[in-house]
Amino acid sequence: DKVSVIEEFNDALKESVAETSEEFMERFFNGEDFTYAEMAQGLRQGVRELSIFPVLCGSAVAGMGSLMLLDNIMELLPSPEQGNYHKATLADGTTEEFVVSAGGVPTAFVFKTISDQYGKYSFVKVLSGSITPDMTMVNARTGDNEKLGRLYTMRGKKATEVKELVCGDIGAIAKMDKVKTGDTLCDSRKVVALKGIPFAEPCYSVAIAPKTRGQDDKVAQGLNRLNEEDPSFSVVNNAETHQMVLSGAGDMQVDVLVSKLKTRFNVEVELSPVRVAYREKIRKTVQKQGRHK
């Protein structure tokens, strides 16, 4: 029944909390219960050590679980200043702990990209110092200087222009054409590269082609723009089968990409199975006489 299921998960939660300290572990084996404050303390410690990953349920459409999510973020997640779990690679190749600091040199991490026919937005979280429009920063991946465009804070689809983003802020920078998701923008006084975002290898492939002849370049351009937003899929032109092969996590991701090509880039495509380029191996040499006409 439901009660037994709840008790089972509650016991698993207590065991996870007990593993965060020797004191809690001893009390757990002695059969003692934890108070609410002690449970919260253990969860905070586990989250900070990346040994506990809370999962919450809710629905933004139905308005369910939003307050619970915010309360748990405030109570369980460490603040950026408490975390200090960012690994940074310096220009000389050595690594160090990156310290989040409002008074440090400006550093921002690009965690998302949105690109459409009207332009490109690079979403960043400022991890140190502050950034302003027209500031010149270094892209740690390329070593190039990047002049920042206009800065925005996003609320849904509404973009509000701001004059500054400070440490801890999440915002968007316009027209950063050479910047990709996972890049670190930093001050020239201290060039650091934070660990990028790992993406799973694509495991599902289909051939993609335009419904209207002559729109291959338009399809390729649209997929390249979408790949800036979602690097988890790949596009390869197979020279042997003469097919454009789209690879992703599954058919749902492919369907979303096809829909975006139609709505945002005004190009319709059709999908087909990937052709296999069969090969035969020469196993041995033989001598044969014959007449060639």
Residue ranges of model-derived segments:
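Structural and coupling elements of P-loop NTPases
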Residues: 1-293
